[in-house]
Every structure is written in structure tokens, then in C-alpha cells.
UniProtKB/Swiss-Prot annotation:
One of its GO terms (molecular function) is ATP binding. PANTHER family: DNA POLYMERASE III SUBUNIT EPSILON. Its EC number is 3.1.-.-. Residues 713-893 form the Helicase C-terminal domain. Transmembrane segments: none annotated. ATP binds at A276, P277, L278, G279, S280, G281, K282, S283. It comes from Staphylococcus haemolyticus (strain JCSC1435). Residues 8-161 form the Exonuclease domain. The keyword Transferase does not apply. This is 3'-5' exonuclease DinG. The keyword Membrane does not apply. GO terms for biological process: DNA replication proofreading. One of its GO terms (cellular component) is cytosol. Keywords: ATP-binding, Exonuclease, Hydrolase, Nuclease, Nucleotide-binding. The lineage of its organism: Bacteria, Bacillati, Bacillota, Bacilli, Bacillales.
Length: 900
């Protein structure tokens, strides 16, 4: 690394508006030779008020800056610290622009010669990290960060992560390092200087035996599984007792009972539905049952979970714990569809692609660092999003495998006979059709969080025509001979002429004209769809922020689709008999696009359920046409029920009105299921109150202002007494934002952080909610699925409305043909399940103090109130006005304070 010196900078500011906000803290950590060589830190005085959100985030209050210097008083000192060093920051634009502006105000022209963005660096060095927020990076890489969002600690943490990334790069094989260097020239900042020094100083040594080489790619070799050596002389009860004792867990008869039930289904090839309450230890129960079954019969067991989080918990925590307890080595692995695994030939093609787009360039570098450490080749590890995902998906679709290709899915197939427990998720389980031979090796399956299975099945029964996706796919072909694949074809024809290649002549002009016409026909199709939307009744479910048209005439759409499909077919005829790789790639891309149009055309001809979606009513680019091709019941029957001899469905919420009938309705009628309800380990919810306000009028759209004002009154009463956090759940964004506006206007909430749910930001918001003491989280009904609600005092959830899906929710429309009464058979059970899930996850143990406030009096006064009674029967229920609510909260708070 030579003698390069780095200044790793972190700033805290009063906000993110460069023209208005000011720096309130600076932290600098100096790095030389991969070691921290010093630090600099100062609070900075400002005449601006520090907003409550910034105070909560940074723990910096106005009083802490009273004795601090203004920036101009220490500007020269800071400038001297920075001027001859590489300027480094995490998301460097923010810090660099703020400090440049601060220097500019002091008549100092600060222009660092070299700049490094650790956000860019960490994406390349740590390609599988779920998040590149500093606090999460620190946690993932075991670097202490006690006070996130304090400049001094953040700067040091960033520096330590940077050093770790540098050290990782220095250990890479020289061929990988060189490729990273060449690619880094297309980055925004100066990482290429760092990599150049590493290449220059790299010791040339033979390639380590743990690595292999495919063309120019260095990859980590896979180690085949060994035959399992797991044996146990004793019963399942003995196995359970030994594991519980060894791991110092509580012996729970209900947990053993659950495990015994599951083993019985496996041994007798039965199909069962089991309701086991949250907190009953389901994971350990079914893992031990699967292990015992494998020991006694030698047969594999598939376990399907709802989330990647639970998959990782099973593979990285629960199974290793059992191995430790029994001194075993259980062969358990993740099972997915073939398309979810990488091939080295695909990576090679991506690296050879001349695309210099910034995100694609980052992806190329990520692939190089990932493939040298992955043992599975699981594409999902890369957490691809946005443009990267679109690009990658297109490359998969158009990839023509080379003969000597190495596909990571073959490792799973090769080792399948040694796998004892396969772990998958609901989406892959349902998506896995006949092409996934690996699933056919499993005769027995346990499905956890089974209540979510129909949602995943619903995702598999639709096809869509997406304007933005089709525009992107057609764009990859190009519109003239100077663009994308058309450019490659034109180049091939020039080579044929100049080098006399032994291939048939290509009608480049005719091809270009056809492709141009396909572009125009696509625009015409979506112009017609846009016109239909503008002239139709448009509905909004107020959750997904999309607009929908459910009833429309598809005559013109079918005519347009026919013209496009016909034109693509005629274009494909140009390539008849041609086998060159470039032509194969273009042909495959055209076939992919053609299939998209053709499938929708056939579905509309067959009068399948369909609807139009548009995210922005003024933008054609946000249009989708969605059609339903299969019944959810058929998908669940053929892809789940008929696939396994033994099948066990487990969830904390499988019953509706104390019966399994609603869940049974998802499958064909002639199947017998054994049904079990495991008693809860929490005998009652004595510490939890359900409160129904009597002074809030029943909701209707005419009284929404009064309804919202009542919700805010109760929130205000609660926080005034407890001085603590609160979660408020809504079924519409409109009502949520109305409450937010009122909260922001009231002085009571000046020192509170009001968080509102944003799409794709749930994880981040939950983290903030759990980290802050004085915060209010406003979320939609997606939070009814629950999360790890952390609170020092009362866990309070206020429910604006029960979690019924909006009547304009697309699920409602798609499922209407599958039930005699969509409300009674689908919507109501779904609402009750969501309600039960939310409450069940709120109260996790006997010590939790819970308060649930339901403003929706349908909970106790509607025709279907009895269906919610199953959820509430173990809770204390109270009804009263806001004064009685105040007394109840005071009483609960007094009890908590007395027990401290």
C-alpha cells in the first residue's frame, strides 16, 4: 500500500439540505499502512436548532454545543489534517459536499486530489452483505460500534471496515486483483489507485489448491458432502432430552409432543395440519423429528420456510446447535431451483460484455470477489436490486451455455443422496416444477409458517406484460445497427464479408427494419392500454400505491398483440439454419420477448381473469397488464400436495373459528388431513389488555377527519403518561399520513421521532423504532405479520382498522372465481389470521406487558365478531372512553415502575 495516508471522515449535521443545514460534529480517523495512526474529533457549534429526529439519531442536543467552536474557528486546523491525505467517507458525496461548503464559507478552497467512497468499496469487498448501512456492516463484520451516528465512532468504524476490505483484496489471487483493477477505472472515485498499488506489490505465487480456474475466472472449489455418520440408540424422547440438556434449554412437554406428532406423520406417510402457537419451539421440534426419521429410515426430509431469515436460522444456528449437542454432522443444505444458481460460463459472458454502466460495472466486480468465496453459487446471496437485477435476469434469459460450462446446481444434484435435511422456501417449493429434479428426491416435506403458502401460490398463477420491462428487453436488442445486439450482428456481417467467414449472409437492413417496427408496435400496444385506463373507472387499494382497472375490453389489445407476435415470428425466420453464437443470443432474446407477448395473448383469448395496473396515472411507463392463468388450489395441489408422500403443515395460525376448514379449502376435497392443535406454553395473556374505545364513532369515509383526530387523542394520552414508544397500524396510506400530519402539528410530539412506513424500507424503520425510546411508528397492515418489537416498558399497539384487505385489492379480484363467497371464505379468514399473527408476535413471553387498542369496533360489534373471539379469548378485554383509558395506562405503568 506504499505510504498512502487516508483521512476517514464522518460528519453529523442538522439535516441533509446542503444549502441550509450545518455541521454539528466532525470525526476523522487517520490510516496508514493498514493501521489507525491517529484521530481528530470536535463538536461544532451552530445557530440552527437541532431537529428532534437528529437529536434522537445522534444523541447530540443543543446544550452539548454551547461550549463548542464554530466551524470557522477550527477550519484551518481541519484543513491541515485533510489536505495531503486521501479523503474517505461512507457515501462520500454527503460528507465531501458539506465540508467543501463549510470550507468555502471560510474562503478555503478544499479540493482533495484523491477521494474514496467506502460505500462503493464495501459493495465490492462484501458483495453478499444485506445492507451497506454502517451499523449493519459493523455488526456483520464484528467491529464494535456502540454509538452509531456519532461522528468520531462512525469514522473509526469506517476506517476499520476499510482496512479489513483492503486486507481482503490483498489476499486475492493476482488474476482476480488485476481484473478488479481494470474494472475499477470505470468507478466514480479513486479505488483504482489503491488496487494498482496492490497489484504492483502482489507476490506472484502459484494458485492455491482451494481455487480453480475457468477461462479468466478464479473460483473457490466445492467440496463434496461425505456420507452422513449420524446414529442414535434411543427414542425421540431420549433424543429430545439429550439435546435440551446439552444446550441448557428448558424441557417443554408441548415441544416434545409437537416433535412426536411430526415424526408420526413422517413414519406413516400421512398428511397433517398442526397449529402450534408462537413461542412453542417449532423449529427444534421439527428438526429433531426430521433427524430421527432420517436415522431410522435413511430417507431425506424437505423443510420449507417462509423467509430467508428463518432459513438462515435453521442452517446457521439451529442445526449447528443440534450438531454440537449430539456430536453429529448433519448434512443439511439449501435447496433451490436451478435458475437460482450461477454458472461460471454466465459470469464469463457478463465480464466480456462491453457495457460500462456504473451499476453493471459494480456487479462485475462483485461477481469476481463473490465467486472466489462462495461454496454454493446461490445467486440470491448477491441481493441484486433495481438495474443490476434487470441486467442480470436478462443475461440469464439470453445466456447460451458453453460446452465446458460449470454450473453450481450440479453440486446439489451430485450430493443429493448424502443430504439428510433440505431447506427451501415456499416460493421455490411452489415454483419447482418438473425441471427441478432435485425436489423429486424428497418424499417427505414439513412446511413451517404454512398460513403464508397461498400467498406464494398466488404469485405463481399470474403472468404480466410490463411496459418498463419490455422497453428494457427491446432496448437490449437496439433500434439500429449502432446499438447493442444489432451492433454485434452488423459487426458479424462485416466480418463475414472482410474475413470470408463460412456463415450465411445476414440481411442486416431487413432485420433493423423489423426490429424498429417491433419497437413501434410495442408503443402502439401500450398507447392503447393507456387510453383504456384514461377512459375507465380506476380504483386504488391504498396500500400498494397503484391504480387498477378491473373491467376492460381486450379486443384492441389482442389485435396489437397478434401483430407483434406475427412480426417477431417473421423476424426469427431470418435466422433459420444459422448457428453462430451471436445470432443464437439475439434469437434467444427475441424468443424470450415473443413468449411474453404470446402467453398474454393466449390468456386473454381464453378469457382468463385480468386487470390493468398503473403506478402513476400520467406515466405510460408504469403500466402492467396482469392475467391469472391457474387456480391457486390447482397450484397448491399439483406442486405441493401431490409431490410428497408425507406432508406436514405447521403454523401458529392455521385454524379459523377453531377449525382447519379454511386452510383445507386450498386443496382438493378428497384428501384426508390429520389435524392437531398444540396447547400454548403461555397459559394466558394476563399481562396484556385489549382496549376498545367507546367514544370513537364507527368509521366511514364521511367521518374520517373525526376518526383520525380520535386516534391522535389516544396516542397523545398514551405518550403523555408513559413517555415511551407506540406502534399504530393502518390499512390505508391516506389515513396514516393524516395522523402523521396531526402528530407533527402538536407540541406534545416535538421531542418524538414519528416514523412512517415506506415501501421496501420496513427493516430499516423497525431498527430505528427499536433503537429509539421516544418514537411512534405508523405502519400499514403488512406489520400485522409481526416483528421483534423491543420496548423497556409497555408494548403498545394501536389498530386504526382491522386488517381486512381493501375490496379493490388485486388479491380480491384474482381470487373471486375460486370461492362461493370471497369475503366469507377468503377475506375474513385472511383478516383474522393477520390479526392473530400480529398479537401472537407482540407478546413473546410471560414478562411482556402488552396493550392493544382497537379503534375499529367491528372487533366486538360486527356480524363476524365471533371469528375474532378466538384471538381475544385469553386477553383481558376492556371497553371505555379516553378517561378510563388513561386510568388503565396509569395502572399498567405504575405496576411496571413498582417492579423495577
Amino acid at each position: 500500500m506504499g505510504h498512502t495516508s487516508y483521512a476517514v471522515v464522518d460528519l453529523e449535521t442538522t439535516g441533509n439540505q446542503l444549502d441550509y443545514d450545518e455541521i454539528i460534529q466532525i470525526g476523522i480517523t487517520f490510516v496508514s499502512n493498514n493501521k489507525i495512526s491517529g484521530t481528530y474529533h470536535s463538536m461544532i457549534r451552530t445557530d440552527l436548532d437541532i431537529p428532534p429526529f437528529i437529536q434522537a439519531l445522534t444523541s447530540i442536543e443543543d446544550t452539548m454545543l454551547e461550549q463548542a467552536p464554530y466551524f470557522h474557528e477550527i477550519a484551518q486546523e481541519i484543513y491541515k489534517q485533510l489536505k495531503d491525505r486521501v479523503f474517505v467517507a461512507h457515501n462520500v458525496d454527503f460528507d465531501l459536499n458539506f465540508i467543501k461548503k463549510a470550507f468555502q464559507n471560510c474562503n478555503i478552497d478544499f479540493k482533495p486530489k484523491k477521494v474514496l467512497d467506502t460505500l462503493e468499496l464495501f459493495k465490492i469487498a462484501y458483495p453478499t452483505d444485506k445492507s451497506y448501512q454502517l451499523s449493519e456492516l459493523a455488526e456483520a463484520h464484528d467491529i464494535p460500534l456502540d454509538n452509531a451516528h456519532r461522528a468520531d465512532e462512525d469514522a473509526t468504524t469506517t476506517a476499520l471496515l476499510m482496512i479489513k476490505a483492503f486486507q481482503k483484496f490483498e489476499q486475492l489471487p493476482i488474476d482476480t486483483l488485476k481484473q478488479l483493477y481494470y474494472l475499477s477505472k470505470n468507478l466514480k472515485y479513486d479505488l483504482f489507485n489503491v488496487l494498482f498499488e496492490m497489484v504492483r506489490q502482489h507476490e506472484n505465487s502459484p494458485l492455491d489448491n482451494q481455487y480453480g480456474q475457468f477461462e479468466q475466472i478464479i473460483y473457490k472449489k466445492q467440496i463434496d458432502l461425505k456420507a452422513p455418520k449420524t446414529s442414535f440408540n434411543g427414542s425421540l424422547k431420549d433424543l429430545y432430552s439429550e439435546v435440551v440438556k446439552s444446550l441448557n434449554l428448558t424441557y417443554r412437554p408441548q415441544q416434545l409432543y409437537l416433535s412426536e406428532i411430526i415424526l408420526e406423520q413422517l413414519m406413516h406417510n400421512d398428511k397433517a395440519m398442526i397449529e402450534a402457537p408462537l413461542g412453542s419451539g417449532k423449529s427444534l421440534a421439527y428438526l429433531l423429528a426430521a433427524l430421527m426419521y432420517n436415522i431410522e429410515t435413511g430417507r431425506h426430509v424437505m423443510i420449507s420456510t417462509n423467509t430467508k431469515l428463518l432459513q438462515n436460522q435453521l442452517l446457521l444456528k439451529d442445526i449447528p446447535s443440534i450438531n454440537q449437542a449430539l456430536n453429529f454432522k448433519i448434512n443439511a443444505t439449501l435447496i433451490k431451483s436451478k435458475s437460482e444458481y450461477i454458472s461460471l460460463g454466465l459470469i464469463s459472458q457478463i465480464l466480456k460484455d462491453e457495457t460500462t454502466n456504473y451499476e453493471v460495472n459494480i456487479l462485475k466486480m462483485q461477481l469476481l470477489t463473490w465467486i472466489i468465496e462462495t461454496e454454493t453459487g446461490d445467486i440470491q446471496d448477491l441481493n441484486l436490486k433495481g438495474g443490476q437485477k434487470m441486467y442480470f435476469d436478462q443475461k440469464i434469459e439470453t445466456y447460451v451455455p458453453v460446452r465446458h460450462d460449470m454450473h453450481y446446481y450440479n453440486y446439489i444434484k451430485r450430493n443429493a443422496h448424502h443430504i439428510q435435511i433440505g431447506i427451501t422456501n415456499h416460493a421455490h417449493l411452489i415454483h419447482s416444477d418438473q425441471e427441478n429434479s432435485i425436489y423429486q428426491l424428497f418424499d417427505d416435506c414439513i412446511i413451517d409458517e404454512a398460513h403464508r403458502l397461498p400467498d406464494y401460490a398466488l404469485n405463481q398463477v399470474t403472468n404480466d406484460l410490463d411496459y418498463s420491462d419490455l422497453k428494457y428487453q427491446l432496448g437490449l436488442i437496439g433500434k439500429n445497427e449502432n446499438e447493442k445486439l444489432l451492433k454485434a450482428i452488423d459487426k458479424l456481417e462485416q466480418q463475414r464479408i472482410l474475413e470470408r467467414l463460412d456463415i450465411a449472409p445476414i440481411d442486416v437492413f431487413g432485420l433493423k427494419m423489423n426490429i424498429s417496427e417491433i419497437h413501434d408496435l410495442n408503443e402502439r400496444l401500450f398507447n392503447h392500454i393507456f387510453e383504456i385506463i384514461q377512459n375507465s373507472d380506476v380504483y386504488d387499494d391504498d396500500i400498494h400505491r397503484h391504480h387498477y382497472v378491473f373491467e376492460f375490453d381486450s379486443t384492441q389489445i389482442l389485435k396489437d398483440l397478434h401483430l407483434i407476435v406475427d412480426k417477431i415470428n417473421k423476424t426469427l425466420e431470418i435466422f433459420n439454419g444459422m448457428t453462430h453464437k451471436t445470432i443464437k443470443t439475439l434469437r434467444k432474446q427475441l424468443l424470450y420477448i415473443n413468449d411474453t407477448y404470446r402467453n398474454i395473448e393466449q390468456s386473454l383469448k381464453d378469457k382468463h381473469t385480468a386487470y390493468l395496473s398503473i403506478r402513476n396515472l400520467t406515466q405510460k411507463s408504469t403500466i402492467k397488464l396482469i392475467v391469472k392463468d391457474y387456480a391457486v388450489r390447482d397450484i397448491l395441489t399439483t406442486r405441493v400436495l401431490d409431490k410428497f408422500n408425507s406432508l406436514t403443515f405447521i403454523s401458529g395460525t392455521l385454524t379459523f373459528n377453531h377449525k382447519f376448514d379454511a386452510f383445507k379449502n386450498w386443496f382438493k376435497e378428497d384428501v384426508h388431513f390429520n389435524t392437531y392443535q398444540v396447547p400454548s406454553t403461555l397459559s394466558n395473556h394476563a399481562n396484556t389488555n385489549v382496549y376498545i374505545p367507546s367514544d370513537v364513532s364507527s368509521y366511514n369515509f364521511k367521518n374520517i377527519d373525526d376518526y383520525v383526530a380520535s386516534i391522535v387523542d389516544y396516542i397523545q394520552e398514551y405518550v403523555t403518561i408513559t413517555d415511551s414508544k407506540c406502534l399504530v397500524l393502518f390499512t390505508s396510506y391516506r389515513m396514516m399520513h393524516m395522523v402523521q400530519e396531526l402528530l407533527n402539528e402538536l407540541p406534545t410530539f416535538e421531542d418524538y421521532v414519528v416514523l412512517t412506513q415506506q415501501q421496501n424500507q420496513n427493516y430499516k424503520i423497525v431498527q430505528q423504532f427499536n433503537n429509539f425510546d421516544k418514537t411512534i411508528l405508523l405502519g400499514t397492515s403488512t406489520f400485522f405479520e409481526g416483528f421483534d418489537y423491543q420496548a423497556k416498558g409497555i408494548k403498545c399497539v394501536m389498530i386504526a382498522k382491522l386488517p381486512f384487505m381493501n375490496k379493490y385489492n388485486t388479491k380480491h379480484w384474482l381470487m373471486d372465481s375460486e370461492f362461493d363467497s370471497t369475503f366469507k371464505d377468503y377475506v375474513l379468514p385472511d383478516a383474522v389470521t393477520r390479526f392473530r399473527q400480529g398479537l401472537g408476535r407482540l407478546i413473546r413471553n410471560e414478562d411482556d406487558q402488552g396493550l392493544i387498542v382497537s379503534f375499529d369496533d367491528r372487533l366486538v360489534s360486527s356480524n363476524y365478531k365471533n371469528f375474532f373471539a378466538q384471538t381475544l379469548e385469553n386477553y383481558k378485554q376492556k371497553k371505555g372512553d379516553i378517561k378510563q383509558f388513561s386510568k388503565l395506562v396509569n395502572k399498567i405503568q405504575h405496576n411496571i415502575d413498582a417492579n423495577k
